[in-house]
From Swiss-Prot:
InterPro entries: Adenyl_kin_sub, Adenylat/UMP-CMP_kin, Adenylat_kinase_CS, Adenylate_kinase_lid-dom, P-loop_NTPase
Pfam families (alphabetical): ADK, ADK_lid
Compartment(s): Cytoplasm
Protein name in UniProt: Adenylate kinase 3
The UniProt record lists the keyword Hydrolase: no
One term under GO cellular component: cytoplasm
EC number: 2.7.4.3
Binding site for ATP: 38-43, 155
Keywords: ATP-binding, Cytoplasm, Kinase, Nucleotide-binding, Transferase
Lineage: Eukaryota, Viridiplantae, Streptophyta, Embryophyta, Tracheophyta
Catalytic activity: AMP + ATP = 2 ADP
Residues reported to bind AMP: 59, 64, 85-87, 113-116, 120, 188, 199
Length: 241
């Protein structure tokens, strides 16, 4: 239910009004982000969201929200999950359709984590066509696997604080120890070379047909994701301008 405006603090209300005024002149955009783990999507996504006044739609988050809100689609999704089944493509597309109706999605969206297959891409296109819209751009965060391995397998975490380090790019003062507490650092299970290799193999097999599908439509922008974040941001802005 919408909040009573009288109960919203003035500063929050003013900030939101200014945001909407700034966004009113922005062109609508519907963008898909594609890229392997560690490619930098997470760094660029909030910048794209703020710059172009888009909402960020991550399929995992949307599914959890729909289940928690007990929407009709969320109830169906929970039934599938409780049985240990995958949530059907039609259900996921329906949940995306629901999410797109939010006020924050008026100027368009960034879709992250979907589509993962050509069939999903086709179903998404069909749903958007019914609304008279389409995907405007697919940002492909292209990066060599060897660079990803260096990025990811060098990551170390201080468990209790969440502080992160990298053996090459942001090393601790003393190898293997947290700068503040001197406690040992750990590596996430997913950040090992063996786990990364299998994740990347699965990603390439699954994603290449999707990129080919959108390339035929002429809407893929291949980004040099190995570059420093600020340079990637410049490429993103050029691709979306």
């Amino acid at each position: 239910m919408a909040a009573n405006l009288e109960d919203v603090p003035s500063m929050e209300l003013m900030t939101e009004l200014l945001r909407r005024m700034k966004c009113s002149s922005k062109p609508d955009k519907r963008v898909i982000l594609v890229g392997p783990p560690g490619c930098g999507k997470g760094t660029q996504s909030p910048l794209i969201k703020d710059e172009f006044c888009l909402c960020h739609l991550a399929t995992g988050d949307m599914l959890r929200a729909a289940v928690a809100a007990k929407t009709p689609l969320g109830i169906k999704a929970k039934e599938a999950m409780d049985k240990g089944e995958l949530v059907s493509d039609d259900l996921v597309v329906g949940i995306i359709d629901e999410a797109m109706k939010k006020t924050s999605c008026q100027k368009g969206f960034i879709l992250d984590g979907f589509p993962r297959t050509v069939v999903q891409a086709q179903k998404l296109d069909e749903m958007l066509a019914k609304q008279g819209t389409k995907i405007d751009k697919v940002l492909n965060f292209a990066i060599d696997d060897a660079i990803l391995e260096e990025r990811i397998t060098g990551r170390w975490i201080h468990p209790s604080s969440g502080r992160s380090y990298h053996t090459k790019f942001a090393p601790p003062k003393t190898p293997g120890l947290d700068d503040v507490t001197g406690e040992p650092l750990i590596q996430r299970k997913d950040d090992t070379a063996a786990v990364l290799k299998s994740r990347l193999e699965a990603f390439h097999v699954q994603t290449k047909p999707v990129i080919d599908y959108y390339t035929k439509k002429g809407i893929v922008a291949n980004l040099h994701a190995e570059k420093p974040p600020k340079e990637v941001t410049v490429e993103v802005q050029k691709a979306l301008s």
